[in-house]
Amino acid sequence: MEAGYAEIAAVQFNIAGDNDHKRQGVMEVTISNLFEGTLPAEGGIYDARMGTTDHHYKCITCSHQRKQCMGHPGILQMHAPVLQPLFIAEIRRWLRVICLNCGAPIVDLKRYEHLIRPKRLIEAASSQTEGKQCYVCKAVHPKIIKDSEDYFTFWVDQQGKIDKLYPQIIREIFSRVTYDTVVKLGRSKNSHPEKLVLKAIQIPPISIRPGIRLGIGSGPQSFHDINNVIQYLVRKNLLIPKDLQIVRGQKIPLNIDRNLQTIQQLYYNFLLDSVSTTATQGGTGKRGIVMGARPAPSIMRRLPRKEGRIRKSLLGSQVWSISRSTICGNSDLHLDEVGYPISFARTLQVAETVQHYNINRLMPYFLNGKRQYPGCSRVYKQITQSVHDIEGLKQDFRLEVGDILYRDVVTGDVAFFNRQPSLERSSIGVHRIVVLENPKISTFQMNVSACAWYNADFDGDQMNLWVPWSVMSRVEAELLCSVRNWFISTKSSGPVNGQVQDSTVGSFLLTRTNTPMGKNVMNKLHAMGLFQTTQTDPPCFANYSPTDLLDGKSVVSMLLRQTPINYQRAPTWYSEVYAPYMHYNKQDISTQIRNGELIEGVLDKKAVGAGSSGGIYHLISRRYGPQQALKMIFATQQLALNYVRNAGFTVSTADMLLTPEAHQEVQEIINELLLESEEINNRLLHGDIMPPIGLTTHDFYEKLQLNALKFPDRILKPIMNSINPETNGLFQMVATGAKGSNPNMIHIMAGIGQIEINTQRIQPQFSFGRTLVYYPRFALEAQAYGFICNSYIAGLTSPEFIFGEMNGRFDLINKALSTSSTGYANRKAIFGLQSCIVDYYRRVSIDTRLVQQLYGEDGLDARQLETVRFETIMLSDQELEDKFKYTGIQSPLFEEEFSRLKKDRDKYRQIFLNVENFNFSQLLTDVRQVPVNVASIVKNILLSSASGVLPFDEKTILQKYTMVKTFCKNLPYVFINNIQERLQTPIPVYLKRAASLMRMLIRIELATVKTLNITCEQMSAILDLIRLQYTQSLINYGEAVGILAAQSVSEPLTQYMLDSHHRSVAGGTNKSGIVRPQEIFSAKPVEAEQSSEMLLRLKNPEVETNKTYAQEIANSIELITFERLILQWHLLYETYSSTKKNVMYPDFASDVEWMTDFLENHPLLQPPEDIANWCIRLELNKTTMILKSISLESIINSLRAKHPNTYIMHSVENTASGIPIIIRIYLRESAFRRSTNTRMATDEKIAVNVVDKLLNSTIRGIPGIKNANVVKLMRHRVDAQGKLVRLDNIYAIKTNGTNIFGAMLDDNIDPYTIVSSSIGDTMELYGIEAARQKIISEIRTVMGDKGPNHRHLLMYADLMTRTGQVTSLEKAGLNAREPSNVLLRMALSSPVQVLTDAAVDSAVNPIYGIAAPTLMGSVPRIGTMYSDIIMDEKYITENYKSVDSMIDML
């Protein structure tokens, strides 16, 4: 009878007690000896019943040798119980909540019934139990004291009498606890507290603490250090009497007491890390033992960290053999090929099973052996099941069917190619090997266009390559991991590969119109030569004579006709920046390809460059597949490179030199910048710089200098006037997008400008007031702070060179420091989202818990999208009617059609105008990503059919309209199935919404007025193609979309964090690159956020367009504390007297005059009788008061209202220039306590506290708003004619700090358009759905143009808000979202703590996701493994055919 099998559904964690250890143990350790002679000592810690790691003897338990024996645990019977070191806190909780006399609970269990199970015992133990009387035996519960000197010792304080609780006493107490009490306190029966005190401990198997015996017999031996710990434990245990009985309150001998403590400490060291080599550490009472010069190892030490068992062995994947080398470029190789050195090919072996169909192919390998390539190294003989070295075979050895031949790698084998760090799934791709026969080559070679998959370059990068062994592995590798699958990026939905650098420039030069000297005009033979290396079907040149001339466009069109597409877009070559300085050929300012024919324009980065979304290769991939796109990239690359080799292209120093006139003009521009900088210096010296509120004078001065020293756009004029754009190689590389940018060109030819480090000029850190040794102290000229006047071609002076190196060093250091942070952030994201998998309904769920009702809200794969334009969005009502309303036939159907188009337009506007209003910088646009480009399909159908179609009758037009209407109605059934479509079952609302954008586009592109020249047959073909492409664009079942989202966000976020420190001549942002992402993903509360902002629109439309009024409102909401208005303050101790004509402190003698005037002018504000001798004298900042429109009267009124125990006097507000406004605040006796002997010290403390309260008093504004400035917005609105109008003159208030509720209470603020960057503030006021939207918008705002497809952002937001609260991607957030997935949380971090908590709670871990099945040794249910394959073995057996029968059939 065969044993059945099943998958493990769940794993339960429990605390192991004595019975568990005894049941699992195969023997009892009784002695500490290791060996007796050459064999392990029986009953010793190396007893052969626990396994073997030695080839001299077998395991007694399983009779296996060391390679087959898994090991078996033993037990050590303790003479005295020991506490379980992992659960000391749990032991203390139980001692606090149960009676030490009868074991009954001391607390009222009903008080904790409402809590979740894991929290009950914790809450009960945290309550006050000392002195409580037991409900059962009436005993008074003592105070439980934790020994500060010994981690494992507890004391009880019973009315002043302190007794020690030995483990034996604790065990007796816990034995009286009933299972009912355990369950009511939230613990499982399997976690009974009696298990926390052990009488029998488990000894691990030999296999996890192996020993190495050097020599035979009594030769030297080396054993694992943990064996020494076990030896000590056994020896100390033997020193304890077997019949030792300890009674509570009884004194025991000191030597036994010490031995008990030592045993407990040894058991702790055996399980957990030794904390120190000293007696104690930090007062914790944990003592460590030392083995030689290092702390003793432990069992739990093997779990955590990168080198631990979990991350290194269980989660990590290892291969038998792998090769690694430096990579270099080789454009002769196809993108899916990799050049492999022959020395590597002869070392790395491929296992191939001999079959009838391949024995003749494998025989040459077998005969060559190791002598000649291609050969083999060994053979596995199926009959004998043995492996034979190829060089030791006998002459009569025969290669037979079923044998396995380990042959050399040959051209055509598939191999995995990988570069670390593997931040995206394209970092591991499958290539076809091309063996490089040259023995001098020892590097991997790859096409330069293939680098984008791996984010690699050729500056010394190394990559790994390994070959799958089995046939199944090779087939799976080619189908699942082929680089053609990675051609479209999951992150950006655009193509990853394309032309780079030389081939981009070559494509441009080849396709230009009127190239100088006619370099891209060639005869038939030259054109044929360009196609020699393209590896495509050569075009037909039979129609051309040898004297006919072909231009580059014609040659490229011959290649494009093999994959006919339609393309129209402005090239990168044409730029408005260059237009004033150069002449553009009209035929080169727009690239147009019609049915594979390059009609006009050039091919540059926008058309054929790497990562060009909507480019030529993207269109080819969408229509003909990614494999054809890769072939076209290679073919175009070969054309371009062959042309460049023949025509020539170079960049020389002559391309970088300016003419004398241009150089003079550049110097004039630089001198103007330096002059403006000098004027700012003069303003600083004369005190004329008035900083805005929130900035110091120094900060504002630096900001003015940075703005003044930026190169203006007109610096391009002398550069462009001194070069010839038609022949200048440097300019052509920049203009075509091949390499470089305008700032690079300016740095090389004109000047470098201001060097900035972290958005600041070079600071004087060399010494006090000096930036470098070359400049004097307190120098003010711009050159002393990093302004470089020279260009790279002109050469740099010594200080200029040092300034440039400062910036480079800063970038290097930041990259090194940020790598660890971003790497860990990536790992947390992977673990946080890896359980999110698409099910059969295209929902995203964690096991059975729903995360998204439909993936990405539309169920589409991010790789299957392309950008299209919705024509109706920007049209007014009249324009829409003129363009889309069909009036040829009077029918209510066409009125209905136009009404539907108008509703679609208005719905689109409503949705994305709301998005615009509630985001900082996301404006409405009519461009969206959709799975089907309907206009392209229509154009292709029309171009592929006969032209000159006659107008159709009314019946045909109505029939086409009905077809489109029915198709749009049934489109959501694509998410369900054809059966439901035939039955016309109701469609869920969320599925209708998922298809709404696509239905809008179909109605626009297939409107009646646009399809008059289409037949019904063509319309049917168009609709079928739309449905096919839409179906193919849906996300696959079992897709691990959580990991895809983590990779797609983490990789660009990593780059964003690194790039945030890199500054150019244009300056950069002042936000730290890592702070804001951490705030978002860590779900920090409002008070912990450092960079929260608000955008406030004004309620009154008239005020919204007036900057002055807007600034007044901004001033009114900005939080102004009294401290911000003060220049300086003094706390004085002096006797007040109204008749006194002077004051105690001579420095303030002038105060007497205004104080006298104050008393005369304010007869009702006379000093009170209880005025004290403490006075606070303050000088106000008049500049701040003027800028913030704060009057002295408002300040005084606010202070008097908030501080009634004071008497306030002040000078007049309109003082002369240079004379400050002074306020004196006298404290009253009521503010102090009753007089004591220490009156002076006490009063001083009280006075200081009053000063603190005064300074923090709010004068005006909303709490939380640290700063408020007026900003100009760009927004859209719909006018009366239905036209979408862009408004550029709207002013809003941008704040530093957030308080949505406070802003809503202000009558000037529009409460419906308040935008806050704070996720916590949004959550508190608007709820979880608003917080979800805020997470999406904030990630998009932070990442900007580097942001991934919005589906990945939705994945983040939905996961973080799934529980109804905003949870972080940190460990705490994972615990909240997946509390039952112990294995996943253990794999992330702190495995010992996670396992301990799981055992205490008796947690049950369902096996789902990725980490849990991997740790259990099974394959996760994702991808192609998501669906079970059912095989009909009976059918296969009945229809099995042998090779002979198949040959007979043929």
Curated annotation (Swiss-Prot):
What GO CC annotations are associated with the protein?
A: DNA-directed RNA polymerase complex; virion component
- Give the Enzyme Commission number: 2.7.7.6
Q: Which reaction does it catalyse?
A: RNA(n) + a ribonucleoside 5'-triphosphate = RNA(n+1) + diphosphate
**The UniProt record lists the keyword Nucleotidyltransferase:** yes
Q: What class of enzyme is it?
A: transferase
Q: Which UniProt keywords apply?
A: DNA-directed RNA polymerase, Nucleotidyltransferase, Transcription, Transferase, Viral transcription, Virion
SUPFAM superfamilies with a match to the protein in the record: beta and beta-prime subunits of DNA dependent RNA-polymerase (SSF64484)
* Induction, per UniProt: Expressed in the late phase of the viral replicative cycle.
Cellular compartments annotated:
Virion
Name the GO terms of the biological process aspect.
DNA-templated transcription; viral transcription
- Identify the InterPro entries for this entry: DNA-dir_RpoC_beta_prime, RNA_pol_asu, RNA_pol_N, RNA_pol_Rpb1_1, RNA_pol_Rpb1_3, RNA_pol_Rpb1_3_sf, RNA_pol_Rpb1_4, RNA_pol_Rpb1_5
**Would you indicate the residue range of the signal peptide?**
none
Question: What family does the Swiss-Prot or TrEMBL record give for this protein?
Answer: Belongs to the RNA polymerase beta' chain family.
Known role: Catalytic component of the DNA-directed RNA polymerase (RNAP) that catalyzes the transcription in the cytoplasm of viral DNA into RNA using the four ribonucleoside triphosphates as substrates. Forms the polymerase active center together with RPB2. Part of the core element with the central large cleft, the clamp element that moves to open and close the cleft and the jaws that are thought to grab the incoming DNA template.
Q: How does it assemble?
A: Part of the viral DNA-directed RNA polymerase that consists of 8 polII-like subunits (RPB1, RPB2, RPB3, RPB5, RPB6, RPB7, RPB9, RPB10), a capping enzyme and a termination factor.
Record remark on domains:
Lacks the typical C-terminal domain (CTD).
Record-given protein name: DNA-directed RNA polymerase RPB1 homolog
Q: Which organism is it from?
A: African swine fever virus (isolate Warthog/Namibia/Wart80/1980) (ASFV)
Taxonomic path: Viruses, Varidnaviria, Bamfordvirae, Nucleocytoviricota, Pokkesviricetes
